[in-house]
């Protein structure tokens, strides 16, 4: 059965994000993936600490000139017969809720782990988010050109800490200075590693068969025998790859390699285009929307503010769920009920910000936004439905915000509410006093808010420390118990930017005790937009 041209386009799409702890090699992997997708000709050489700072500052200069950094957010490139959309999740300096929400717009994730360190804190947090939707995960064990931990130990750690089964696809031969390559468990082939070829795509020498004498000659008898012994163990102790379990988010195929040496990245990409799902259906408040439907629908998962105060435009990122976007089409913004003509949407083909003529499910569009689009907004061709599952996360850092000029309280509140709608920060107004508490997931968010309040709302604000450890959204089906809870805990209650009731806990102990005391009240870590 031949698919219609529309369905052929849908079937070609793969949309994924890379999740990792800072410094596990995400930037390098992104570069190498783009190299394989022919999106760039040679990968930028970021060497060690000294020049990586240098590369970052170059970017910052460029971003200042460009006014808005979009290229790093979404990259589309061809690979084999597929079109791959790679969504960037910001690293440590600018880690924020954006990162979490980006994961709601992808169909699959690549988890990059530094094989010298194993599972780290940020990876755990990001995995919790992918769990909300059982997103399929591929794993890349990186930095095999350094001395790493025992590979079996790494797999055990992923299984125990992240609660996902590991199915090794490739297996390393040596590591550090002795790193010789990887063996592919399902193709019965060994790929030999050459040093110094990290910036371009290299011709890899392949040895067929595990018991081939050429293997002993290539890697040395000791390492060849060690590989055979390890593989016996691995095949006995680890999971076999099963596509259905992968798609259900229960097992992760594991690849070994070095992104810096550009080795093993293509094995992972081959797995990604072969196994990762084409654009998936998405839930709305009324029904499930399939990617095969020809009427357009999409949702906004991120809003990127402009860094240049002269241009107030912000870009809203929309994931296309169904239908084909064509330039100049009329779409309904469901929240406002208004129809808008979208003629200047942006697409992101390999590092260029260009106006798009058409886009399909799985693709990401950039919409110019003058403050009218919010995170979680749904756009359709008229149907009144709202996509669900774009969450707000309970912040982990809190500060009280105070004005230098007390007469500007109104502007401050307006600015904070708008910034919270955009997802830049969360704001809480305690019921029992006039404080304003700002909550964030990353420290950088606080600095951004003060800078933007000054440049966009002409308000000078400063922060003070506040006795808040965490926040939870509260609700209950038992009205009587809920009233009692509200009456007795008034001093700990606040309203967020969308007027949702929140419990502000001074300590985790306080939160745990309160939860025990009021079993009929739900304390939620996430809230839908």
Swiss-Prot record:
The chain positions of domain tr-type G read: 11-280
Molecular function (GO) terms listed?
A: GTP binding; GTPase activity; guanosine tetraphosphate binding; translation release factor activity, codon nonspecific; translation release factor activity, codon specific
Function, as annotated: Increases the formation of ribosomal termination complexes and stimulates activities of RF-1 and RF-2. It binds guanine nucleotides and has strong preference for UGA stop codons. It may interact directly with the ribosome. The stimulation of RF-1 and RF-2 is significantly reduced by GTP and GDP, but not by GMP.
Q: What is its main location?
A: cytoplasm
Task: State its location(s).
Answer: Cytoplasm
Gene Ontology BP annotations: regulation of translational termination
What keywords were assigned to this record?
A: Cytoplasm, GTP-binding, Nucleotide-binding, Protein biosynthesis
Q: List positions binding GTP.
A: 20-27, 88-92, 142-145
Q: What is this protein called?
A: Peptide chain release factor 3
* UniProt family annotation: Belongs to the TRAFAC class translation factor GTPase superfamily. Classic translation factor GTPase family. PrfC subfamily.
Q: Which SUPFAM superfamilies match?
A: EF-G C-terminal domain-like (SSF54980), P-loop containing nucleoside triphosphate hydrolases (SSF52540), Translation proteins (SSF50447)
GO CC entries: cytosol
């Amino acid at each position: 059965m031949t698919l219609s041209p529309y369905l052929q386009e849908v079937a070609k799409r793969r949309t994924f994000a890379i999740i990792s702890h800072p410094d596990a090699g995400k930037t390098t992997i992104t570069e190498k993936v783009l190299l394989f997708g022919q999106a760039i000709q040679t990968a930028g050489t970021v060497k060690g600490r000294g020049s990586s700072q240098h590369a970052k500052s170059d970017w910052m200069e460029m971003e200042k000139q460009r006014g808005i950094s979009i290229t790093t957010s979404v990259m589309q490139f061809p690979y084999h017969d597929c079109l791959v959309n790679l969504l960037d999740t910001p690293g440590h300096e600018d880690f924020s809720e954006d990162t979490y929400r980006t994961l709601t717009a992808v169909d699959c994730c690549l988890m990059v782990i530094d094989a010298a360190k194993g599972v780290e804190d940020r990876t755990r947090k990001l995995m919790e988010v992918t769990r909300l939707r059982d997103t399929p995960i591929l794993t890349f064990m990186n930095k095999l050109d350094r001395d790493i931990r025992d590979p079996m130990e790494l797999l055990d750690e992923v299984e125990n800490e992240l609660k996902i089964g590991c199915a090794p696809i490739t297996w390393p031969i040596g590591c550090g200075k002795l790193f010789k390559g990887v063996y592919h468990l399902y193709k019965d082939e060994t790929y030999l590693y050459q040093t110094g070829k990290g910036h371009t795509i290299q011709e890899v020498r392949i040895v067929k068969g595990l018991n081939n004498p050429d293997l002993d000659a290539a890697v040395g008898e000791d390492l060849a025998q060690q590989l055979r012994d390890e593989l016996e163990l691995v095949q006995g102790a680890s999971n076999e790859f099963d596509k259905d379990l992968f798609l259900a988010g229960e097992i992760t195929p594991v690849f070994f390699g070095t992104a810096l040496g550009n080795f093993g990245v293509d094995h992972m990409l081959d797995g990604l285009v072969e196994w990762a799902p084409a654009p998936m259906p998405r839930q709305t408040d009324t029904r499930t929307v399939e990617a095969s439907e020809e009427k357009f629908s999409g949702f906004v998962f991120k809003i990127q503010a402009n860094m240049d105060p002269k241009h107030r435009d912000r870009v809203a990122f929309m994931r296309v769920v169904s239908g084909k976007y064509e330039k100049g089409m009329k779409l309904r913004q469901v929240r406002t009920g208004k129809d808008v003509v979208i003629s200047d949407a942006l697409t992101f083909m390999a590092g260029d910000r260009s106006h798009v003529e058409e886009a399909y499910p799985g693709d990401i569009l950039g919409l110019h936004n003058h403050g009218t689009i919010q995170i979680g907004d749904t756009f359709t061709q008229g149907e009144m439905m709202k996509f669900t599952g774009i969450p707000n996360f309970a912040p982990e850092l809190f500060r009280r915000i105070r004005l230098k000029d007390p007469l500007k309280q109104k502007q401050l509140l307006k600015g904070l509410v708008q910034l919270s709608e955009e997802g830049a920060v969360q704001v809480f107004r305690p019921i029992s006093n006039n404080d304003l508490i700002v909550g964030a997931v990353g420290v950088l968010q606080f600095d951004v808010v003060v800078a933007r309040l000054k440049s966009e709302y002409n308000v000078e604000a400063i922060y003070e420390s506040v006795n808040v450890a965490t926040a939870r959204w509260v609700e209950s089906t038992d009205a009587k118990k809920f009233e009692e809870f509200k009456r007795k805990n008034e001093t700990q209650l606040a309203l967020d930017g969308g007027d949702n009731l929140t419990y502000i806990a001074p300590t985790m102990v306080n939160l745990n005790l309160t939860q025990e005391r009021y079993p009929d009240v739900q304390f939620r870590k996430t809230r839908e937009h």
